[in-house]
């Protein structure tokens, strides 16, 4: 962490030596006839300095050897130090900043020599009493900063902070001007004080340990600024892209897995042993995706950053709910993936033998193993957001290790073993010499092709999640060690938005999000786009019933249109043939009666 004790002298040096030396030189006009009166250029974006704290921003004094940009950079540094540290809390008031700005950019006036007709620019310096009040409120001792400091040049001493007036030596003449009372500026301005520069957020802590536990992150000790949320690990647009990726995949996986659960588990007329396992795997994936969908509906950034400058913690219900759900469902996913890998391998290995239905044992064991760790974690207030987390997760590494990665790693290894055994069986099938056994096993292999593909796809995602998390934990010191450099960047950079902590590559984090949210999409590609799914929906009772209703409605509409057409034609015929005799009408009725008899006979045969 950055030491406040080491930084305090720097501030005083800036006040007394670095900038005072420049400005002191500039007030002796025989030495600086190139000084000018300029209009204040305005503060740097996101960094409040002197906007609203100048008596006359349209006319400020700038000497010939300096520039507004250079002076502003020094002023920003002093202002950053004052804002950053709690030791200067009493300095954060309009009077301090009015004095600072009157010193950095003194009001400029012009004087024209009546003899030489040369116009000179000269500054109106802040008064001694204003400086004295500032050192008192900031609790700065006179040994570090004396308001009686004088600058001597060519055997003439000038006060940096004049008590009443300043005499300017202009050629052979002298010109006297009253000092500027900066308290009048402070009392008349309505500008609110920017306590911390972005991306830091102002927060006065009375109990830093408690504040850290509820989501505040302090970049240094003895500071009133906390790290903004989202954390400055990536740029704002990069965080938005990460959140957008998570939202889209969560909603998509949620919808697709819900469709598959309904298809294979509810409307499926013949639920097989593998269908039961797949339904449980898909239900687990649905819960996993639903945890992300909850964040989406609540606003992902709002969930992870419930307050400005505070990351989500155990006191935020939505964060806790999504973390708890993600924890349990992820353990369910890896368990049912392991069960599926075992069942596929064992079915091919024991081809021709009747398999027992072990579903109820799998169900009871998986529920116990999956939900005990989350229950323990939630009782210990372990779920929270964090600087690098795109979702709410376990806070401490030990809980992540024993409550999640230990069971996850065990089932990942077991599933990997079954996957290797499955590959061996495939090799045996391909290279086997016994034709009958080869044909029967190849038939089973063809039937289990999709479960095999799904196992490989799930395994690749789960393995990446495991490797990435372990790598992050092993390199955490890289990010924490970058905090002092980050704090220094905030204090010295002209654009604080360019200051970032060291972070994992954004591509790796993006693929991490992809891997944890994409399971539902993979499942739909494998099981949703299939002949079996089409057949289940095609012959489903409700689909058939709705289809019949639509067909009846279509037929009725067609018949009605045909009847209307016939009636219209008959009406036209009557009007045209109104003079026809009764013999013709009788003959038409007889012909109609014969045709109706034929139609009835045909319907009877069909029935």
UniProtKB/Swiss-Prot annotation:
Biased composition (Low complexity): 559-575
Cysteines paired by S-S bonds: 37-108, 50-101, 127-179
Motif Lys-Thr-X-X-X-Trp motif, mediates interaction with the PDZ domain of Dvl family members boundaries: 532-537
Lineage top rank: taxon: Eukaryota
FZ domain boundaries: 32-182
Signal peptide from the UniProt entry: 1-26
This protein's name: Frizzled and smoothened-like protein J
Species of provenance: Dictyostelium discoideum (Social amoeba)
Native organism taxonomy: Eukaryota, Amoebozoa, Evosea, Eumycetozoa, Dictyostelia
């Amino acid at each position: 962490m950055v030491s406040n004790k080491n930084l305090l002298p720097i501030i005083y040096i800036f006040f007394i030596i670095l900038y005072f030396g420049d400005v002191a030189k500039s007030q002796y006009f025989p030495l600086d006839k190139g000084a000018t009166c300029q209009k204040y250029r305005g503060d740097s974006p996101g960094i409040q300095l002197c906007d609203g704290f100048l008596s006359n921003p349209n006319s400020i004094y700038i000497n010939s050897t300096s520039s507004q940009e250079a002076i502003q950079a020094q002023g920003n540094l002093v202002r950053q130090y004052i804002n950053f540290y709690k030791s200067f809390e009493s300095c954060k008031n309009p009077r301090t900043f009015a004095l600072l700005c009157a010193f950095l950019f003194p009001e400029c006036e012009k004087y024209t020599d009546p003899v030489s007709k040369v116009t000179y620019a000269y500054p109106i310096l802040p008064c001694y009493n204003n400086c004295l009040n500032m050192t008192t409120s900031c609790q700065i001792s006179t040994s570090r900063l004396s308001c009686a400091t004088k600058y001597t040049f060519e055997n003439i001493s000038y006060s940096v902070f004049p008590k009443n007036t300043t005499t300017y030596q202009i050629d052979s003449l002298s010109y006297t001007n009253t000092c500027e009372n900066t308290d009048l500026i402070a009392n008349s301005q309505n500008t609110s004080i920017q306590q911390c520069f972005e991306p830091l957020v102002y927060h006065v802590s009375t109990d830093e340990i408690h504040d850290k536990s509820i989501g505040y992150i302090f970049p240094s000790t003895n500071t009133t600024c906390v790290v903004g949320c989202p954390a400055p690990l990536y740029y704002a647009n990069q965080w938005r892209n990460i959140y957008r990726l998570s939202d889209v995949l969560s909603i998509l996986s949620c919808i697709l897995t819900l469709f598959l659960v309904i298809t294979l588990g509810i409307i499926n007329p013949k639920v097989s042993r593998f269908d039961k396992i797949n339904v449980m795997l898909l239900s687990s994936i649905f819960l996993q995706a639903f945890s992300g969908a909850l964040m989406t509906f609540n606003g992902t950034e709002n969930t992870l950053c419930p307050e400005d400058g505070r990351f989500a913690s155990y006191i935020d219900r939505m964060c806790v709910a999504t973390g708890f759900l993600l924890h349990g469902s992820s353990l369910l996913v890896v368990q049912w993936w392991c069960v599926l890998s075992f069942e596929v391998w064992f079915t091919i290995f024991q081809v021709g033998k009747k398999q027992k239905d072990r579903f109820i044992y799998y169900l009871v064991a998986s529920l116990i193993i999956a939900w005990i760790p989350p229950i323990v974690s939630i009782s210990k207030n372990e779920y929270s957001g964090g600087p690098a987390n795109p979702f709410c997760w376990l806070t401490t590494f030990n809980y992540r290790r024993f409550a999640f990665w230990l069971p996850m790693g065990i089932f990942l290894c077991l599933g990997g073993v079954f996957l290797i055994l499955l590959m061996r069986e495939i090799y045996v099938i391909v290279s086997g010499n016994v034709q009958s056994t080869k044909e029967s096993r190849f038939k089973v292999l063809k039937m289990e092709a999709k479960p095999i593909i799904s196992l490989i796809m799930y395994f690749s995602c789960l393995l990446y999640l495991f490797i990435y998390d372990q790598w992050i934990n092993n390199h955490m010191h890289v990010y924490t060690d970058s905090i002092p450099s980050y704090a220094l960047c905030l204090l010295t950079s002209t654009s604080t938005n360019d200051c970032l902590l060291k972070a994992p590559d954004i591509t790796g984090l993006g693929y991490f999000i992809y891997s944890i949210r994409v399971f539902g999409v993979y499942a739909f590609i494998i099981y949703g786009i299939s002949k079996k799914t089409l057949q289940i929906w095609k012959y489903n009772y409700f689909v058939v019933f709705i289809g019949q209703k639509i067909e009846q409605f279509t037929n009725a509409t067609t018949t009605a249109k045909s009847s209307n057409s016939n009636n219209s034609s008959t009406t036209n015929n009557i009007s045209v043939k109104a003079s026809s005799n009764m013999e013709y009408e009788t003959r038409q009725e007889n012909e109609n009666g014969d045709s109706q008899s034929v139609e009835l006979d045909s319907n009877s045969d069909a029935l």
